[in-house]
Each structure stands twice: as structure tokens, then as C-alpha cells.
């Protein structure tokens, strides 16, 4: 708001101008609305699909909230999540288990006022845009958008094992895991922000079943000293052998806007700062063996 006095004559004039009072009356009492939606679909023993949605418009608030406490943004989000057992597509005798999980979530927040000119509502700024490109650019700056996706296969395995005495080469000893997480964000100060994480792992675990070697068990002497000796034995194989190999990769990329030049109007809406990024790759390996060599049988 600007107040002033203009002299339309050619003569120079002097005077005093007093502004005694500036008052705002009648708050903008327009209300808003909100809605939630949920959907759950069960696909027999194959899995399930869940969908949720939520929307909150500007001006929404609780009954006890004042005008200043009400939201000034339009916010919308939806999410779809599915969990499936892909092993159901294989014959039962194959004993295949492939638990699959996938989800996608999208959020969008649109402010009421133009972030480049907070005295103007966003819809008025879009209407005043001179071209479609300028309109799209203003909308991309004003709105904050977040997209997240998750995909994973956890402990996929083929449960075929040798009966009674599991062998080290049985397919049931192996399991495989893979996951990918992705997030992409755009907003007022961020042209885009990207986060990615990949993980792959292979696990092996073998627990042999065997009878311990007890060389003195057959002694029939009733001496208590020999009785103690009879309870000793030797486990000639470990109780469990396991190893794990895991590879992870993380990637991060951030492209920020040059807000100083953007707010001053000395550059276009596509002005940006230097790109920031980071990347990490890890390969972790773990081996474990559980072996109680000596066996002692407690008296019954």
C-alpha cells in the first residue's frame, strides 16, 4: 500500500500531510474443507492393495481455531501400497516364496499467495502471466511436490531341502533381498532434490542335523567317575554356518534456485545455483560359525 500527494501545477508548494489512522476491518472469514478416503482390497492369499487419499483446502481449521490459525495452503496427497506373494504363481511343490512390496506416495502443497510477491494471490499471478511458459514456471516455484516410491523383494527363497539331513547345497539355505527407495522433491527454493537408495543382499545359512560322537557312552561300569566320562561327547560339525554379502548404493542430488536474483527480478525464473550431489557405494560381507565342539549330557 502506498499513500502520497501529487502536485499537478507548475508551482512549488509546501505543506504537511497527516495520516492519523490506518485500520483493517472484517477478517476474511471464508472457510475451507477437508476429506479423507481409504480403500483396502484383499486378493485372497496372493496379497493386498491399499489406497489412501487426503485433501485440505485453504481456510480449513478446527472450530476453536482463530482466523490466523487456519491453513493458507491447499494440500493434497495420495498413496497406493501393495504387498504380494509372487511365489503363488509357481507350483506348490517348488516351494517358492517371493514377498513383493511396492508403494507410491505423492504430495502437493499449493500456497494461497505468490511466493515471489506475497501481496498477490497465486491465482491472480497465474492469470497475469504473459505466456504459458511463465505461468508454468510460477506454478512450479509456488507448489511443493514430493514423490516417493518404494520397491522391495524380501527374503526370496526356494524352500527345497534334503529330508532329515539338510545338505550344504540345498536351495533352502539361500535367500535373496533387493530394494530401491526413491524420492523426488520440487519447491520454492528447490528446482529439484533427488534421493535414491539401492540395496541387494544374498544370505546363506546351513544348520546340519547329525548325531554327536560319544565314544564312552557304551561303558557299563557303574563308577561315578566313568559315569561323568560317559556324558562327554564331540560335535564333529558346527551347529550353524552362515554368511551374508550386501551391496548398497546411495545417490543424492540437489539443484537449488538462486532466490536472491529471482526475488530481485534481475534473472529469469530458471536461475539456479551450482549443483550439489553425493554418491556412496558399500559392499559389506559377514561370515559366522556357531560350533560348540564339546558335548556334555546332563544326567536324567
Locate each region found by the language model.
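Transmembrane beta-strands of outer-membrane beta-barrel pores
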Residues: 7, 26, 55-59, 102-110, ...
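Outer-membrane beta-barrel translocator/channel fold
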Residues: 55-77
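Extracellular beta-strand ligand-recognition surfaces/modules
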Residues: 1-12
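Outer-membrane beta-barrel translocator domains and adjoining extracellular loop/strand segments
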Residues: 11-14, 61-68, 109-121, 128, ...
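Conserved small/polar residues in nucleotide/adenosyl-binding loops
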Residues: 296-300
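Short loop/turn motifs that connect adjacent beta-strands in outer-membrane beta-barrel proteins
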Residues: 45-46, 84-101, 110-115, 154-174, ...
Amino acid at each position: 500500500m502506498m499513500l502520497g500527494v501529487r502536485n499537478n501545477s507548475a508551482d512549488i508548494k509546501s505543506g504537511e500531510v497527516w495520516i492519523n489512522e490506518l485500520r483493517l476491518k472484517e477478517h476474511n472469514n471464508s472457510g475451507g474443507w477437508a476429506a479423507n478416503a481409504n480403500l483396502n482390497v484383499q486378493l485372497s492369499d496372493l496379497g493386498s492393495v491399499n489406497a489412501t487419499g487426503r485433501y485440505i483446502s485453504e481456510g480449513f481449521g478446527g472450530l476453536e481455531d482463530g482466523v490466523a490459525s487456519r491453513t493458507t495452503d491447499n494440500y493434497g496427497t495420495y498413496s497406493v501400497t501393495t504387498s504380494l506373494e509372487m511365489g503363488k504363481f509357481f507350483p506348490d511343490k517348488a516351494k517358492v516364496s517371493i514377498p513383493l512390496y511396492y508403494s507410491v506416495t505423492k504430495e502437493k502443497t499449493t500456497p494461497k499467495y505468490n511466493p515471489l510477491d506475497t501481496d498477490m494471490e497465486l491465482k491472480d499471478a497465474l492469470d497475469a502471466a504473459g505466456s504459458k511458459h511463465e505461468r508454468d514456471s510460477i506454478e512450479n516455484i509456488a507448489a511443493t511436490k514430493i514423490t516417493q516410491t518404494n520397491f522391495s523383494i524380501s527374503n526370496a527363497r526356494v524352500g527345497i531341502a534334503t529330508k532329515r539331513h539338510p545338505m550344504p547345497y540345498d536351495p533352502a539355505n539361500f535367500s535373496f533381498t533387493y530394494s530401491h527407495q526413491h524420492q523426488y522433491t520440487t519447491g520454492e527454493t528447490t528446482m529439484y532434490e533427488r534421493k535414491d537408495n539401492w540395496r541387494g543382499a544374498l544370505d546363506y545359512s546351513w544348520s546340519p542335523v547329525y548325531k554327536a560322537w560319544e565314544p564312552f557312552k557304551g561303558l557299563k561300569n557303574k563308577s561315578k567317575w566313568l559315569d561323568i566320562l560317559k556324558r562327554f561327547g564331540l560335535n564333529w560339525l558346527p551347529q550353524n554356518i552362515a554368511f551374508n554379502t550386501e551391496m548398497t548404493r546411495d545417490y543424492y542430488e540437489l539443484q537449488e534456485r538462486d532466490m536472491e536474483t529471482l526475488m530481485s527480478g534481475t534473472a529469469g525464473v530458471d536461475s539456479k545455483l551450482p549443483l550439489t550431489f553425493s554418491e556412496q557405494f558399500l559392499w559389506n560381507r559377514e561370515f559366522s560359525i556357531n560350533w560348540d565342539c564339546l558335548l556334555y549330557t546332563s544326567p536324567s
